[in-house]
Amino acid sequence: MGASAGGHLASMLSTHYSDSASRPDFQVLLYPVVTMDRSYTHKGSRDNLLGKNASEEQEKRFSNELQVTPSTPQAFIVLSSDDRTVPPANSVNYYSSLIANGVPATMHIYPVGGHGWGFRDSFKYKR
């Protein structure tokens, strides 16, 4: 389970595991950073992980939507469509890759909430 940059870590564990013993059984991602593609990544997360001068090979290796296989564990992804910190395309493209590879996945998109709502009592949908 991971939120924001922690979502990148959780999706890394789910797509880069070395053998079946280290493969997670499932992944829960909240408004995750998934890609390192410059056009829609979270720049701060990208720079912190890869540095400012990352190669194209590094960018692709750490763009987890490109690393999904039929063996990737099932996923539950939650985000808000108005997230201005981590573009929703991170989650949408990851979900699409999971489905294209036959991996069971569920995605819920709240219409409002922005980023980081899991830690805010003011989140509209929090009970």
Q: Where on the chain are the PLM-derived regions?
A:
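Loop/turn elements at helix/coil->beta-strand transitions in domains of secreted/extracellular proteins
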Residues: 23-26, 72-75, 101-106
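Short, hinge-like loop/turn segments at secondary-structure boundaries
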Residues: 17, 45-46, 124-126
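Short beta-strand/loop motif that positions the catalytic acidic residue
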Residues: 71, 76-79, 83
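C-terminal catalytic histidine-bearing segment of alpha/beta-hydrolase fold enzymes
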Residues: 88-127
